[in-house]
């Protein structure tokens, strides 16, 4: 209940921010945080709750961005373009999920990374290097609708994952993560639950890619397929607390703000610093900021008793 109340207050605070300030730098920072929440939460469903450590998340992000951008620039209503992008990402997810789920462990991760790279190279060879929005749309560009769209998307991703994980289906997904053979023996269809987690995950990240394409004035199709998006999702989820609802939210806040600070102070070293931070988190705080906060609370409680 406390987490729900905290989430509502946080979302309300972000929703009220444009009423307090019109500074574009703060609103753009908010958009980056919301996109990071959605990106990490969509990966968290498949990688954290279903236990399928995919390294191909960027493929679905890129497909959502590409389809949405093409349709929206072509004159389609934004909501239809976003829905089409998510639908294409989901369809591609099912297409590669059926053969990919035959692989286990590291082989699954490497296989999804290889498929994502094949798609990235293909798009780079077939699509133009850059896409800019039409002059009429550029003249009327406004950060506010992008801000509220990405905020709504972040809230939607958190809510969908929370509802799914808390349902009977979510119990089956987690059972498959813990022991696939035991889950099968108990009557839980492992492939069915993994495919369902994949479909929801790819739909959410497809919407996220579409929102990214709508947000940017200049859009590089191949950039949206970069493996950096996958590793950002992993890093945010693990820093915050993988396999938890609020972990990706905490991770996104920390990651985006800290990244902005590092990009100014140590522009050439921020990637190295995050790499070292990721290793330290995995080694000493595998539960991320969520675990660190729990440890701190227990320590404070012991000292006050």
Segments and roles (model prediction):
Residues 1-305:
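Transmembrane alpha-helices and adjacent helix-loop boundaries
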């Amino acid at each position: 209940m406390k987490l729900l109340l905290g989430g509502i207050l946080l979302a309300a605070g972000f929703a009220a921010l444009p009423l307090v300030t019109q500074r574009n730098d703060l609103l753009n920072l908010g958009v980056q945080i919301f996109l990071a929440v959605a990106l990490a939460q969509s990966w968290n469903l498949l990688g954290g709750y279903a236990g399928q450590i995919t390294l191909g998340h960027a493929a679905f992000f890129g497909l959502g961005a590409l389809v949405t951008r093409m349709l929206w620039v072509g004159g389609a209503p934004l909501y239809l373009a976003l829905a089409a992008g998510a639908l294409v990402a989901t369809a591609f997810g099912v297409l590669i999920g059926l053969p990919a789920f035959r692989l286990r462990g590291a082989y699954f991760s490497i296989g999804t990374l290889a498929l994502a790279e094949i798609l990235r190279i293909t798009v780079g060879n077939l699509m133009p290097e850059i896409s800019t929005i039409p002059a009429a749309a550029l003249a009327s560009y406004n950060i506010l609708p992008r801000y509220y769209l990405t905020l709504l998307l972040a809230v939607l991703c958190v809510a969908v994952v929370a509802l799914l994980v808390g349902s009977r289906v979510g119990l089956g997904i987690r059972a498959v993560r813990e022991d696939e053979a035991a889950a099968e023996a108990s009557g839980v269809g492992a492939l069915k639950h993994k495919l369902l987690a994949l479909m929801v995950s790819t739909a959410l990240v497809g919407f996220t890619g579409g929102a990214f394409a709508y947000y940017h004035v200049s859009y590089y199709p191949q950039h949206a397929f970069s493996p950096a998006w996958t590793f950002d999702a992993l890093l945010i989820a693990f820093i915050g607390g993988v396999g938890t609802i609020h972990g990706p939210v905490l991770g996104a806040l920390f990651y985006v703000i800290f990244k902005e600070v590092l990009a100014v102070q140590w522009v050439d070293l921020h990637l190295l610093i995050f790499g070292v931070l990721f290793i330290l988190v995995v080694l000493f705080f595998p539960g991320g900021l969520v675990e660190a906060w729990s440890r701190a609370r227990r320590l404070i409680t012991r000292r006050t008793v």
